[in-house]
């Protein structure tokens, strides 16, 4: 992992106190990095399927996703962002495809006490910074 990517992750974690875990998937579908407290490797195939899914107009696509044994209901699925929330209060995930609509991603686990929209702007901005790096 490059120092630039590491710096971007550190900056996001310092800025966004409700981001409790971060992972980056490269455009090739492989994990580039993840924070020590969040391991997505066992869920990588499903995450890649989700990222590679191209929705036809009016179609729902994948409706739920499990990461580290926690099931998230997909509440928003657009080219810019994919948001999942655990209905039992175990947190949220914000997935920002890199580039927008692409197959890479910045994946963020969000504190259960916060809402996914609390971190959305910052996560999307930092995903844009990764576009030419992954």
Curated annotation (Swiss-Prot):
Gene Ontology terms, MF aspect: actin binding
Cytoplasm listed as a keyword: yes
Annotated transmembrane regions: none
Domains as described in the record: The Loki loop (specific to some members) becomes ordered on binding to rabbit actin.
Family: Belongs to the Asgard profilin family.
Other notes: It is not clear if Loki profilins 1, 2 and 3 are from the same strain.
The protein's name in its UniProt record: Loki profilin-1
Organism listed in the record: Lokiarchaeum sp. (strain GC14_75)
């Amino acid at each position: 992992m490059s120092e630039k990517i590491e710096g971007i992750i550190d900056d996001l974690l310092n800025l966004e106190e409700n981001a409790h875990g971060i992972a980056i998937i490269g455009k090739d579908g492989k994990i580039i990095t993840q924070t020590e407290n969040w391991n997505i490797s066992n869920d990588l195939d499903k995450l890649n399927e989700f990222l590679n899914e191209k929705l036809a107009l009016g179609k729902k696509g994948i409706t739920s996703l499990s990461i580290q044994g926690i099931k998230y209901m997909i509440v928003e699925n657009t080219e810019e962002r994919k948001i999942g929330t655990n209905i039992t209060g175990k947190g949220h995930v914000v997935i920002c495809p890199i580039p927008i609509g692409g197959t890479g991603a910045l994946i963020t686990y969000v504190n259960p006490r916060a809402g996914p929209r609390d971190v959305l702007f910052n996560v999307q901005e930092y995903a844009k910074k990764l576009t030419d790096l992954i």
